[in-house]
């Protein structure tokens, strides 16, 4: 039995590698260079279309841990990245042409891989199937995936608000409440008086935004208005939108605030909060500067900054299992950014797990759920259990991990403890499931 893969980006390439390592053949479809996307320049596999950085290398950084876990699992993407690394301080950056060419050569010349350079316009009947078509999935395939998943669970753009660590919010200022005291006090409210709002407003409308790429120019017409664009419509606009204060009383004053920024839990543990209605296209340093002007967020630590860009992805909390299988048809897998993981390394990690599990399906073995205390397990655990209504793509971060059993003081020691626990857990998991780095 052959596994069919749509897309030879980071996820599809890694999935193909993991499958053939298990002795299972692959039919790999890649439409480039016959049909190009607005961002790609070549027909090579795993082409890096934006930065050449795979981000932080140290284990204190969750993406550094994810890379180390992938190395231990025999990742082709990490093998190529390490072989084609270029100096980048504390980050892992690569020679993008050498990196992509290395991966392409290994897969094209592999005896168990059949390459088809053509666009897939309909969902193939072949199973198992891995859909790893990426953030710039073609219009025809997008329509086909919508038919498979349902239109309500398929998106064309990110519109993600910033997320902050709960422990960095000043609870002497912010207060828990829902409007008019209806239901549970599910929102953490950051109140502003008129002078605080005036300063915040001026900073927001004059802050520097990222320039839009040509293929992203229609983004604002999809119903996801950046908070800074909304603000420029008039000084009162936000007061009738995401910063409206109605139904809320500041317990410090006993009065309704002039404006309120609401924070909502991002995960079940309540270790992260997102700024409700604050989808933004501001540059990251500007987000830090402007959003730290919000009372209660002066010392906020950002898990993720807000982003808005072209990105095809599905509603994974509704559709996927933590194995990256489609709930309604477990012989279909999704992998990469289309699942709602964000970033080069995260996409490749999703491909690694999907590929490993597709091979196991062919072999008559049960798919694996990686431990949630590992980086490679925390990602699918998050994207398949996040609140479906507000789901947006996510990078790997230690905020996704289960809390440590013992309290550890200090951010760096806490991150080191997470990394130690993760690698120990991964080694046990690999031994229990007979996963080896070299085959």
UniProtKB/Swiss-Prot annotation:
Localisation: Cytoplasm
UniProt keyword annotations, A-Z: Cytoplasm, FAD, Flavoprotein, Methyltransferase, NAD, NADP, Transferase, tRNA processing
Full protein name: Methylenetetrahydrofolate--tRNA-(uracil-5-)-methyltransferase TrmFO
Name of encoding gene: trmFO
Any GO CC annotation of this UniProt entry: cytosol
Cofactor names: FAD
Reactions it catalyzes: uridine(54) in tRNA + (6R)-5,10-methylene-5,6,7,8-tetrahydrofolate + NADH + H(+) = 5-methyluridine(54) in tRNA + (6S)-5,6,7,8-tetrahydrofolate + NAD(+); uridine(54) in tRNA + (6R)-5,10-methylene-5,6,7,8-tetrahydrofolate + NADPH + H(+) = 5-methyluridine(54) in tRNA + (6S)-5,6,7,8-tetrahydrofolate + NADP(+)
EC number: 2.1.1.74
Top EC class for this record: transferase
Biological function: Catalyzes the folate-dependent formation of 5-methyl-uridine at position 54 (M-5-U54) in all tRNAs.
Naturally occurring in which organism (per UniProt): Heliobacterium modesticaldum (strain ATCC 51547 / Ice1)
GO BP terms: tRNA methylation; tRNA wobble uridine modification
Gene3D superfamilies listed in its UniProt record: FAD/NAD(P)-binding domain
